[in-house]
C-alpha cells in the first residue's frame, strides 16, 4: 500500500479513538503514535518508548483492537515499532496482545536463575547470558556532581577492563542512587567493545542461592570453576554476604583467582567497605585494592535532569513546574522519582486529570513519608539563623558581615524553593530587599553548591532540619 493508505487508515482510527477518550488522554497517548506501514492485514505503528507501548497495551488494547476491526476489518493485527534509543533511532518490534507487557530480549538463551551456574559447564561466550539490563547503560545514566567521579571511573573500567588501577571497582551509596544502573552500564559497554569477553552480572543474593544449591547437589567444584571462567564479574549488593561465612570463603577464592588472572571485578554495596559489619577482614582488604567510589544522593538539579530525561525517553510531556516540584520534594531515591512519573501518568489517564501541580502534589504526598505543614518564611529564618548561630533579627539588618550575608542569601534561596511567594515578597520579608537581590542570592547559592561540597552538605542539613521542624509542628 502507499504511504497515504496507511496514514489514512490510522487517521480514520484516530477519529474513532478521539470520540471515545478524554481529549487530554488522546493528546498524550495517541497523537504521538506514527503509522509506518500496512501490509498482510497488519498495521505497523511507531511509539516513542517501551513504557509508552506497555501503557497502551495495559490500558487501551481493547479500544485499539475494536477500532482496527471497525476501520480495516476483523482479524487486523497491530504491530508496534518501539523506539528504544532516540539518539541512534534503534527500534524493536512488538506485537499487540490482549494483555502484553513483553520486554525486548537479547536473543541469548536464558537459564534457570536458581540453577547453580556450575552445572552449565562453562558455556561458550555466545551461550552465556550476562544477565545485564540493556536499559541500564551510560546513555541513560544522567550525570551530576553527586555521581561524576563514579561515572568517570566506570567508563574508564568499561573502556579497558582489568587494565586500569580500578580493580576491583567498589561502588557504594544509599538505595536508589544508581549503583545497579552504573554496574550494568559497565557490563553493557564491555560487551559492545569486547564481545568475546565473558561478562556476568549477579546479585549477591542469587550468588548465595546458587552456592547453597551447589553444596546440596555436591557440585561446589563446578560452581567455583564456572565463576573462575568469567572475565568481568559484577556482583550487586555485596553487603548481603555479611555474616555468611561459607559464602564469603568461597567468594574469597573466586576473587583471588580472577584478580590474579587479570579479570575485572565490579562490586556494589549500600555502604563503604569500612562500614561493612560481619565481613571477613581479608575480603574487606581486597575490596579496597582498587577504587572505592561513592554515589551520593542526587542534588535537586540532578533530580530535575533525571526526571526530564525519563519523561523525554518515555515520549511524555510534563509542565516545568511539575518537574520542579517533584525534584524538590522527593529526594530519597531515583526509583521514587521514576515511580511518581508513572503514577502521575496513570492518574491523569484513568481519572481524566490534567498533569498539573495539584495532581503532582497529591501523588507526591502519598510517596513522601510524612505530610508536612506548609513551610513559612519565619520557619526558614529561624532554622537558617540557628545554623549560622545568629539571632533571627540579624537577617533583617543591613549588616555586611560574611555570615549574615550568607545566612540571608540561603534564607532567600530556601524561601524561593520551599514557598510559593514571589521574589518581591521574599525580599520584603527577608531584610526588606528588592526582587533583583533575591535573584542574585538564589544564583549565588546555586553556584556555590556546584563547587563547594561542604556548603552543599550544610544546605542539605538545613533543609532536613526545616522538614523535621515542620513535620513535628504538623503533628502537634
Swiss-Prot record:
Q: Which UniProt keywords apply?
A: ATP-binding, Cytoplasm, DNA replication, DNA-binding, Lipid-binding, Nucleotide-binding
| Positions with a binding annotation for ATP | 176, 178-180
Q: What is known of its domains?
A: Domain I is involved in oligomerization and binding regulators, domain II is flexibile and of varying length in different bacteria, domain III forms the AAA+ region, while domain IV binds dsDNA.
The reply on keyword Cytoplasm is: yes
GO biological process terms held by the UniProt record: DNA replication initiation; regulation of DNA replication
| Single GO molecular function | ATP hydrolysis activity
Query: What top-level branch of life does the organism fall under?
Result: Bacteria
Query: Region entry Domain IV, binds dsDNA: which residue ranges?
Result: 349-476
Annotated CDD domains: AAA, Bac_DnaA_C
Task: Return the InterPro entries for the record.
Answer: AAA+_ATPase, Chromosome_initiator_DnaA, Chromosome_initiator_DnaA-like, Chromosome_initiator_DnaA_CS, DnaA_C, DnaA_dom, DnaA_N_dom, DnaA_N_sf
Region (Domain I, interacts with DnaA modulators), start-end ranges: 1-87
What organism is recorded for this protein?
Bacteroides fragilis (strain ATCC 25285 / DSM 2151 / CCUG 4856 / JCM 11019 / LMG 10263 / NCTC 9343 / Onslow / VPI 2553 / EN-2)
Q: Where in the cell is it found?
A: Cytoplasm
Subunit relationships: Oligomerizes as a right-handed, spiral filament on DNA at oriC.
Q: What is this protein called?
A: Chromosomal replication initiator protein DnaA
Choose one Gene Ontology CC annotation of this protein and give it: plasma membrane
Q: Which family does it belong to?
A: Belongs to the DnaA family.
Region (Domain III, AAA+ region) residue ranges read 131-348
Write out the function statement from the record.
Plays an essential role in the initiation and regulation of chromosomal replication. ATP-DnaA binds to the origin of replication (oriC) to initiate formation of the DNA replication initiation complex once per cell cycle. Binds the DnaA box (a 9 base pair repeat at the origin) and separates the double-stranded (ds)DNA. Forms a right-handed helical filament on oriC DNA; dsDNA binds to the exterior of the filament while single-stranded (ss)DNA is stabiized in the filament's interior.
Amino acid at each position: 500500500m502507499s504511504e497515504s493508505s496507511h496514514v489514512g487508515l490510522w487517521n480514520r482510527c484516530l477519529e474513532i479513538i478521539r470520540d471515545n477518550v478524554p481529549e487530554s488522554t488522546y493528546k498524550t497517548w495517541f497523537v504521538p503514535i506514527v503509522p509506518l506501514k500496512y501490509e498482510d492485514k497488519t498495521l505497523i505503528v511507531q511509539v516513542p518508548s517501551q513504557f509508552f507501548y506497555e501503557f497502551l497495551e495495559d490500558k487501551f488494547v481493547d479500544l485499539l483492537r475494536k477500532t482496527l476491526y471497525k476501520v480495516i476489518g476483523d482479524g487486523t493485527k497491530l504491530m508496534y515499532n518501539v523506539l528504544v534509543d532516540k539518539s541512534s533511532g534503534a527500534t524493536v518490534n512488538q506485537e499487540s496482545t490482549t494483555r502484553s507487557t513483553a520486554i525486548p530480549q537479547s536473543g541469548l538463551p536464558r537459564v534457570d536463575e536458581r540453577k547453580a551456574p556450575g552445572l552449565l559447564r562453562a558455556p561458550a561466550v555466545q551461550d552465556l547470558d550476562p544477565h545485564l539490563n540493556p536499559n541500564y547503560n551510560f546513555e541513560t545514566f544522567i550525570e551530576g556532581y553527586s555521581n561524576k567521579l563514579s561515572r568517570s571511573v566506570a567508563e574508564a573500567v568499561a573502556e579497558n577492563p582489568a587494565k586500569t588501577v580500578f580493580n576491583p571497582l567498589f561502588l557504594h551509596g544509599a538505595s536508589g542512587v544508581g549503583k545497579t544502573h552504573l554496574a550494568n552500564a559497565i557490563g553493557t559497554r564491555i560487551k559492545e567493545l569486547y564481545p568475546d569477553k565473558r561478562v556476568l552480572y549477579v546479585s549477591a543474593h542469587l550468588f548465595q542461592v546458587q552456592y547453597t544449591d551447589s553444596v546440596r547437589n555436591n557440585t561446589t567444584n563446578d560452581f567455583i570453576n564456572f565463576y573462575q571462567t568469567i572475565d568481568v564479574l559484577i556482583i550487586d549488593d555485596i553487603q548481603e554476604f555479611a555474616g555468611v561465612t561459607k559464602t564469603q570463603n568461597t567468594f574469597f577464592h573466586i576473587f583471588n583467582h580472577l584478580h590474579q588472572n587479570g579479570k575485572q571485578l565490579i562490586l556494589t554495596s549500600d555502604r563503604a567497605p569500612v562500614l561493612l559489619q560481619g565481613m571477613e577482614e581479608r575480603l574487606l582488604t581486597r575490596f579496597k585494592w582498587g577504587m572505592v567510589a561513592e554515589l551520593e544522593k542526587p542534588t535537586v538539579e540532578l533530580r530535575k535532569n533525571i526526571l526530564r530525561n525519563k519523561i523525554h525517553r518515555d515520549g511524555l510531556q510534563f509542565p516545568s513546574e511539575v518537574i520542579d516540584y517533584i525534584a524538590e520534594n522527593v529526594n530519597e531515591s531515583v526509583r521514587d522519582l521514576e515511580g511518581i512519573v508513572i503514577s502521575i501518568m496513570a492518574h491523569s489517564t484513568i481519572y481524566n486529570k490534567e498533569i498539573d501541580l495539584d495532581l503532582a502534589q497529591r501523588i507526591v504526598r502519598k510517596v513522601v513519608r510524612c505530610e508536612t505543614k506548609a513551610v513559612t518564611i519565619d520557619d526558614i529564618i529561624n532554622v537558617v539563623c540557628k545554623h549560622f548561630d545568629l539571632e533571627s533579627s540579624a537577617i533583617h539588618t543591613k549588616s555586611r558581615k560574611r555570615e549574615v550575608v550568607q545566612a540571608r542569601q540561603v534564607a532567600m534561596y530556601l524561601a524561593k524553593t520551599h514557598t510559593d511567594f514571589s521574589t518581591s515578597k521574599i525580599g520584603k520579608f527577608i531584610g526588606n530587599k528588592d526582587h533583583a537581590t533575591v535573584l542574585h542570592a538564589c544564583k549565588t547559592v546555586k553556584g556555590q553548591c556546584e563547587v563547594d561540597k561542604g556548603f552543599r552538605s550544610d544546605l542539605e542539613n538545613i533543609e532536613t532540619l526545616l522538614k523535621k521542624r515542620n513535620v513535628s509542628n504538623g503533628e502537634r
